Amino acid sequence: MPPRLKRRLALETAQRHGNMNDIAVGILGERYGVPVEPTGRRSTTPGASGVVVLRMPEALKRSLKADARKSKTTTNDLIVRALAESLGVEGRKETMASTNGKGNGRVRSGDKVRVAIIGVGNCACSLVQGVEYYKDAKADEFVPGLMHVDLGGYHVGDIEFTAAFDVTTDKVGKDLGEAIWAHPNNTIKFADVPKTGITVSRGMTHDGIGLYLQDVVEKAPGQTDDVVGILKETGTDVVVNFLPVGSEEATKWYTEQVLNAGCAMVNCMPVFIAREKYWDNRFQQAGVPIIGDDIKSQVGATITHRVLMSIFRDRGVRVDRTFQLNFGGNADFLNMLERERLESKKISKTYSIKSTVPYEMADKNIHVGPSDHVPWLEDRKWAYIRLEGTAFGDVPLNAELKIEVWDSPNSAGVVIDGIRLCKLALDNGISGSLGGPSSYLMKSPPKQYNDDAARDLVEEFIRKNARTKKKEPASKA
C-alpha cells in the first residue's frame, strides 16, 4: 500500500475511533455490495512497511477475485484503488501484472519481491537487518556476501516482507521489527530496523521445538493461523524456511502450505525438499520454483572445508581422513544436543564435503557435524577442521584450520540472493528445483557441482532471465 494512502487510512481510523481493518473492509464492502460486520478488534500500529493485511468475509474475497480476473489485475491493486478513491488519495500508478509459473493463477508484483518468513530466529533477524542495511546501496557497489546488489533487475531494497510465522510467546503477535530481537535470539546487531507493520502470526509447531529448546521457550497459545490465506492475501512471492534443525514434519507441512498458496520457496534448513524427486514434481505441478536444501554460509565451515578438500584433490594429495567439529551458542546448537534431530544435518554436511573428491571415503574416515552447545558463544560458531592425506612417496600431509564466525549474518546475503533468484524464476515461468542456484547456495542440492561451475551456472541463469536485458530462452539450470 502506498505510504500516503496508509497514512490517510490511519488518520481516518483515528478520527472514527475505530480500527483500520474495519474501516478499510467497510469501504470495500460498500463498493462491492457485500455486508460487513465490524470485528471490533484493535489494529496493529502502522509501521514503515507498505504491507497491510486485511481480514474480510469470504463473500467479499470472492467478489474481489472475480473483479480481478475480469480486470486482469490483482486483488491488491483493486483494494488500493478503491481505498484511494474513497479516501481522496492518489493511488497506485503501477500494476502487479506479471504472472508466474505455468499459469497457476497467481499474479506477481512487478517491481518488488514480496517475502514471508517461517521461523523468526537469528537467521530471520540477520536477513531483515541485511535488507535494511543495504536497501540504498549503489547498484555497482561491492557488498560483502552478495553476488550482486542488483541481481537480474532486483535490488536488495526491492525485497519487502509480507508475513512471518513463529510459535513462541515472545514473538507471536509482535511486530517483525521487534520479534527479531526477542528471546532466545542472540545474534549481532548491525542495523536499526524500524517497525515493519508485519505482525508475527501463530504458525504450526509440529516437531519444531526440540527436547532441550522446550526448556527455554514457551509455546504461544491459540490456534495456528491460516498460513495459506495469509500468503495469498499478502501477495507473497517467496517463502523462506528458517525452521530449527530437525523440524522434519513441520517443514513438510509448511511446504504443503507454500504449494497451496502458489509461492516459491527457499529452503534454508536440512530437511530434504528440493533434492527429492517427489517434491520437485510437486513444485513443477504447482508452477513455482524452489531453491534448497540447507543454506551455505558466505564463508563458513562447509565452504572452507570444501575448498581445503579441493586443494588436496587438485594438488594430487589423497584425503585419507577428515573431521569438522562445530561449537555454537544459539538455539540451533541447543536443539542439536538432541542427537535424533541431527540426522539430516549430518547427512547434508557430509554429502557436501564428500562430493569434492572423485573417490569414495569410508564412513569411519569422515566425521562432519555439530559437536556441542556453548551458551557464552551466543550466535558465534567455532569450527575446527582437520585433513589427513597422503602425498608423493606415500608421505603424510596434514592440515588444520579454525574458523570463527557470527553464524546467522554469515548466510543472510546468500539468502537474499536466493530470494531474488526465485523471483526471476517466477517471472520467467520456471518451476521445480533450480539446479545451478541450489548447487551454489545450498549444501544439499539436487545435483552437486563444484563451486566454480555452480557460480557460472547462476550467472548464466541471471543473464538469461534478468528483467533488465533482452532475455534468451528461459532456463532452470
PLM segments and residue spans:
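NAD(P)-dependent Rossmann-like dehydrogenase/reductase catalytic/cofactor-binding core
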Residues: 413-477
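Rossmann-fold dehydrogenase core element
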Residues: 282-295, 316, 320
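N-terminal glycine-/serine-/threonine-rich beta1-alpha1-beta2 phosphate-ribose binding loop
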Residues: 101-254, 342-347, 383, 392
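Active-site-lining helix/loop region of Rossmann-like oxidoreductase modules
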Residues: 118, 160, 171, 182-185, ...
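Surface-exposed, Lys/Arg-rich phosphate-binding patches that contact polyanionic backbones
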Residues: 2-22, 58-77, 81
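Rossmann-fold NAD(P)-binding glycine/threonine-rich loop
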Residues: 244-260, 268-289
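Short Lys/Arg-rich basic patches
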Residues: 1-3, 10-13, 34-56, 69
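Short, basic amphipathic alpha-helical segments that act as recognition/interaction helices
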Residues: 18-40, 73-95
